[in-house]
Amino acid sequence: MKKNILLVGMLVLLLMFVSACSGTASKGSSSDSASEKTEMRTYKSPKGNVNIPAHPKRIVTDFYAGELLSVGANVVGSGSWSFDNPFLKSKLKNVKDVGDPISVEKVMELQPDLIVVMNEENVDKLKKIAPTVVIPYNTAKNVEDTVSMFGDIAGAKDQAKSFMADFNKKAEAAKKKIAGVIDKDATFGIYENTDKGEFWVFNDNGGRGGQAVYNALGLKAPEKIEQDVIKKGEMKQLSQEVIPEYAADYMFITDYNPKGESKTLDKLENSSIWKNLDAVKHNRVFINDFDSFYPYDPISVSKQVDIITDMLIKRAEENKK
């Protein structure tokens, strides 16, 4: 009888101990849950204030993969065009293609905590999935502004500073390399030939190597391009007859020929107007790969600095022969 009473007493004490432990664990779990709650902040975007995660962990974008990756952000989905960029391919291995324009359904599947877009199509639907920041085309004017802006959006200001320190170091080294192979008064132009036979001249912030040439390397544009194109922040289509007015000592041309079937560049190069350009006569025309020179995200611009520097040095050596 005494043994039974003793056993019952021990059982009661055991149950009380388990209950107490359970209560403590429950409180701890509740505390952990509270600490894991996402910290939010207000971001002042060009389109108004947006409440976004202070440190987003899953970002989807249509156009800004390179900008976000440059500051170490975790991009889980990106627009289709990003995957054509040779400088981003290795960084996009685990990133999902969400289409172009981006598919609301594909974005939803990725469960992002932040969406960053240039294109406002379907933006109201995207806002229902996650906080959505709209950054219009040409909001930032150079690499430094771009990196600073996306470092802020991604809660990665330290990474942004680190990227810019490396970028500026590279740009200064590149300037020293080319100083001995180009004349200090030489002019540089950025152009594009299309499969439709259009010929465009570009500014310092429209891709095609403009940021690398004018901003990073500090090279000069002809006065005509400076006044009519760069200062106006525009691209300008040129008729063949006026190309000489916008010609530079060095001409970088992207050839937009997506199907590889267009002969418009051949036609241009065989024209008397083209053959009489000083850049052509002195072998200072560079035909550049469209996919490599179209983008102007910080990672791509950094790579373009390397390519352009190497091209100028190599061509100078060739022209000595």
UniProtKB/Swiss-Prot annotation:
A lipid is attached at residue 21 (N-palmitoyl cysteine). It is found in: Cell membrane; Membrane raft. The complex is composed of an ATP-binding protein (FhuC), two transmembrane proteins (FhuB and FhuG) and a solute-binding protein (FhuD or YxeB). GO terms for cellular component: membrane raft; outer membrane-bounded periplasmic space; plasma membrane. One of its GO terms (biological process) is iron coordination entity transport. Residues 58-316 form the Fe/B12 periplasmic-binding domain. Residues 24-33 have a biased composition (Low complexity). It comes from Bacillus subtilis (strain 168). It comes from the Bacteria. It is a lipid-anchor; Peripheral membrane protein. The keyword Ion transport applies. Belongs to the bacterial solute-binding protein 8 family. This is Iron(3+)-hydroxamate-binding protein YxeB. The lineage of its organism: Bacteria, Bacillati, Bacillota, Bacilli, Bacillales. InterPro entries: ABC_transptr_periplasmic_BD, Bact_iron-sidero_bind. Part of the ABC transporter complex FhuCBGD involved in iron(3+)-hydroxamate import. Binds the iron(3+)-hydroxamate complex and transfers it to the membrane-bound permease. Partially required for the transport of desferrioxamine. A lipid is attached at residue 21 (S-diacylglycerol cysteine). Keywords: Cell membrane, Ion transport, Iron, Iron transport, Lipoprotein, Membrane, Palmitate, Signal, Transport. Residues 24-48 are annotated as: Disordered. Residues 1-20 form the signal peptide.
